[in-house]
Amino acid sequence: MKSPSIFNKIKPQSIQQHPEKNQLNWMLELNKWKEERILTGEIHRPECRNEAAERISCAFLSKQNDIDLSGLNLTTQPPGLQNFTSINLDNNQLTHFDATNYDRLVKLSLNSNALESINFPQGRNVSITHISMNNNCLRNIDIDRLSSITYFSAAHNQLEFVQLESCEWLQYLNLSHNQLTDIIAGNKEELLLLDLSHNKLTSLHNALFPNLNTLLINNNLLSEIKMFYSNFCNIQTLNAANNQLENINLHFLTYLSSIKSLRLDNN
């Protein structure tokens, strides 16, 4: 299923409204980082760090909100990214990303890297709403404190467990193609799409998703669906194919008043 782009235009917000006191420091760090490419295995593409450093400097000086560093084969995180609200680092070779102090960050895309760990923004003023990090090597993530998140996609990783009870504004959640055996989501009144397909789930916890439009739980190990019937009132797409469902309660089908696509085959 094609995921919507997370790099839509965001509201103007000058990154220069509150200039960093340590601006000179991070620019010096950026120059130092640029010269370290040979020590980090990037000698085969020495121009990549030069290009990244140039983009960061130009974007900052021209007061841009977003920075695109995709496809530069980077193996380490460049300095200076805390100045931007939207960061695109798709198609690199990063194994770790630290956004702990990125208070301005709203949208982050780290698709198709080699991520094994990530630190998300922390604190009271965190405003991040969109995170996409499909096609990585993540086993564990902690987004439970990201109360402002509305879009989260971490498909094609190695996640075994996810907890996101505090993400009350979540609208889009894609955790397909992982190793999930359990997920604790809590009540999500804003959730519209939930994709948990291609995992190892044996059951689903009771939780309230009153506005859920699309539920994809195919290709798991589910023997039953323990969800409140009220979750299905607005469902238009439900795919529970390729599980181990033994009995389908016909009473459950009466709640699918809005259904347009239903798959229960191979159970």
Question: What are the residue ranges of the model-derived segments?
Answer:
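Consensus "Asn ladder" position of solenoid repeat domains
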Residues: L72, N92, N113, N136, ...
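C-terminal capping segment of individual leucine-rich repeats
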Residues: F60, S70, G80-N83, D90, ...
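Non-Sec secretion/translocation targeting segments of pathogen effectors
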Residues: M1-I15
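Leucine-rich repeat domain C-terminal region
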Residues: N219, C233-N267
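LRR N-terminal entry segment and analogous cap-like coil->beta motifs
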Residues: E35-H96
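Canonical leucine-rich repeat
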Residues: Q77, F97, I118, I141, ...
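Conserved hydrophobic beta-strand positions in leucine-rich repeat
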Residues: I67, I87-L89, L108-L110, T129-M133, ...
